Amino acid sequence: MSSKIYFNTRRFSPSKWLLGLGTRLHHTLAPAHAKRTASKLLLTPQRNQRDGTAPAGLVKQAVHTSEGTLMSYRLGQGPVWLLMHGWSGSAGQFYPLMSHIAAQGFTAIAYDHPAHGHSAGHTGHLPRFVRAFDELVEKMTAEYGPLQGVIAHSMGGAVTLSSRRRELDALPLLLISPVLDYVPQLYGMVARSGYSIRLFDAVVKEIEQEYQHPLSTVDPLGRLAGRSGLAIIVHDEEDRFAPHGDSLRATQDGRTRLVSTRGLGHGRILASAPAFAAFDQLSAARRAN
């Protein structure tokens, strides 16, 4: 697994032993300072503000939420599909898919998570992303009417499947390279890095208390299995960041469909024909209903 999915580890010492010793001592001797340092280190994404070539007609709009001002990107006319990127990503990754959606007679709206792209903020984590997403859904629904569906990439899948807005469970959902076994993989990655699990757990507990969102309730696979809306996963078998095996597990619910690819990796798949075709299937099914 990679920091590309969950949090920033680029500044970690190459020595796991020294890192573990240092963070444990820091937490013992100065717990408050250690937690602040850990929060800044672990929860600061790699901000990507390179949008690439914006499609003609793209409208940028700031949206104010309790988690700061988020930058949204709108393209097309018609019923709205909402798109969400993953950790250290940006809405610009969706430009090719947004163009395809707009060409099919829909409005595509993507946005930058807090502390990502052109949105405000310096740190991010799943409960913050969920709160911002839920508020954005409320605002988009009030302005444009009911959403037609949701598209999420990478950690965005875990965010979508942790939303407090249960009405989304009835909507079509396109998951691209999703992170589905979020909490075990998150803690496993911290352990493999050598960072103090006790210190990381202290940071997590503060976030849980602030947002009233215990990680014990985060279960993307379980939430996916309980949805009534059609869900399609597009996932590369050689994805180095999000396990393809978890997407295979997701199909055991008998309703979730999986489109497996090879050679598209974790990011290129966003602009691929299989992703476009999966959207076409979902939108056609939505129209038929």
Regions from the PLM with identified roles:
Residues 3-62:
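An N-terminal hydrophobic leader/cap segment in hydrolases
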Residues 224-227, 232-235, 239:
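Short beta-strand/loop motif that positions the catalytic acidic residue
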Residues 240-246:
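Conserved alpha/beta-hydrolase "acid-adjacent" motif
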Residues 264-274:
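Catalytic histidine-centered segment of alpha/beta-hydrolase-like enzymes
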